[in-house]
Regions:
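Nucleotidyltransferase catalytic core that binds NTPs
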Residues: 1-149
Length: 149
């Protein structure tokens, strides 16, 4: 979880009474942490937000939302390219679950460049990660990176 993710979560939590952060499994990516490890880190980073729950699911998002009784999915957007792919996914989700709407929150300017890939690359050069990652995540991130070397 980056500070950009945390910013979107914090803003969404101020809009909704209950916010579920769903950590999905993406076979196209090779994440540094397992889904359960990411859930644990996100829970630490969002512990100050009482209306936020964090879970992992291997279901399609539209099916997961239906099972949880959710009617809105919140997606963060950094650039036009994010919008194109997320808009397509929102149409697919709507087809699979007609009750589901998608809300797009644009990244704050200071997080527009921020991605997990960029943070991984910067971390290899011993850059101070406090501008990119929540404090509870930095130590675990560095430890995992060092273990991979």
């Amino acid at each position: 979880i980056t500070l950009g993710h945390l910013n979107i979560i914090t803003r969404a939590a101020s809009i909704f009474d209950r916010l579920i952060v769903c950590v999905g499994y993406n076979q196209k990516k090779s994440p540094m942490f397992t889904a359960q490890e990411r859930v644990k880190m996100i829970r630490k980073a969002t512990s100050h937000l009482p209306n936020v729950e964090v879970e992992a699911s291997d279901e399609l998002l539209a099916h997961y939302a239906r099972r949880k009784g959710a009617c809105v999915v919140v997606k963060g957007l950094r650039a036009v390219s994010d919008f194109e792919s997320e808009f397509t996914m929102s149409l697919i989700n709507k087809k699979l679950n007609p009750e589901l709407d998608t809300m797009f929150l644009t990244a704050e300017e200071k997080y527009m460049y921020l991605s997990s890939s960029a943070v991984k690359e910067l971390a290899q050069y011993d850059v101070d990660l406090s501008e990119f990652l929540p404090a509870p995540v930095i130590d675990e991130f560095r430890a995992r990176l060092n273990a991979r070397r």
